[in-house]
Amino acid sequence: MHPGGRYLQYADGRPFFYLGDTAWELFHRTTREEARLYLEDRARKGFTVIQAVCLAERDGLRVPNAYGDLPFADAGFTRPNERYFAYVDEVVATADSLGLVIGLLPAWGDKFCLKWGPGPEIFTTGGRAEAFGRYLGERYRTRRNIIWILGGDRPPEGRELILRAFARGIACGVAGREDYSACLITYHPWGKSSSGDWLHDEPWLAFNMQQNGHAYDFDLWERIARDYARRPVKPVLDGEPIYEEHPIDFDREKYGTSEALHVRRAFYHEVFSGACGHTYGCHAVWQMWEPGRYAPVTGPVRSWRESLSLPGAYQVCYGRELIESRPFFRRIPDQGVIAGDAGWGHGRCTATRDSLGTYAMVYSESGRPFAVDLGRVSGKRIVAWWYDVRSGRPLRIGEFRRRDAGATMTFTPPTCGKGNDWVLVLDDARMKYPPPGRCPEARSGAAG
């Protein structure tokens, strides 16, 4: 945790941008060859976290993994099966070798709060939850590539004692005592909510996680801003935004299927509103769906292998590159960068900047023109760029003197309309920042 309380960092102090991918069924449905193929792809693209579940959503207590192993060796679900967890070990180790962190859910939410799904609800007492948490904590105590995620698409209300027991068990397993500084723990809630709605003051909750519920017409920035304003200060991110190629609001006939624009929209509005990172998801990938092998859940469009190269998977990585190309820990949300109307809905513009004013960024979802308060950027001379969020390419607008531009300046993105979203980057020329993003000579698989 960075001392400022807004961002995550590596143990050596380097910035850690949480760029997650959703692979809930990774341990449950893949072979080791498939897991390696998937993890190598995500590492190559630039993801930093893979979210996966030990006791999986898709009937993970009664349907065995790809090698025929169930997670428990007894019908009472009390004795972990070493063969099952040895495979989890192997996948976690493979991820570590590729520089990936595993966002590890001990169990999907139906295992402690049924509401829907196959269950069964096996964690009905604090003792059982603490014992399983301790088992996993001890098993992975030497691993440095794990972030713990409790929950799993359920509200925590009424289950607070169970969650405290899970967290206590994990901490005691990792550190030998109830020391929450030894392990990062968060909570994955159900749709259109945040862990902060219930759990913000829990000592075990290191940062807040949200889920938007796979809707499109959703004011993403407001919920991030709400968690950003909570005290004590804790980082926040969306751990389940709308998945790429997911039925929008679970109603394909009425709203269609999500695409790369929906992915980008969630990323930029939320990160620019103060999120410490973001999670991407693809509808086929989270369930590791292959035709003829598993029953599909709400109609994936193509297999998980084909889905690895969807445009949104590249484009969130371009977003990470943009954020990391400027001073990381000083970044703050600031709608004051936008002079006048910031817009609403799909015409929204969202701004972020350096707290010292050496750079500012504005995301225009529909490519509409907007005015900038130049007083929010330091320096007598300012360098301006457009960042193409579809390709990760920067386009230099030019350099100008502040006194010639006046107090405000209007910028018109190169294109406009649905799917023509852009980021404006303004730099204090004295800083000599490089072009925004990673600036490769060419990109592939990114258009869309």
Model-based region annotation:
Residues 407-409:
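Short strand-edge motifs at loop-to-beta-strand transitions and within beta-strands
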Residues 14, 244-246, 259-398, 413-445:
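Aromatic- and carboxylate-lined catalytic core of secreted/periplasmic carbohydrate-active enzymes
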Residues 19, 398-400:
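Short hydrophobic alpha-helix segments
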Residues 1-5, 379-381:
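A short, compositionally biased
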Residues 45-46, 98, 142-143, 204, ...:
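Structured helix-beta-strand junction loops
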Residues 3-219:
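Active-site mouth of glycoside hydrolases
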Residues 131, 145, 151-288, 293-308:
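Extracellular glycoside hydrolase catalytic/binding regions
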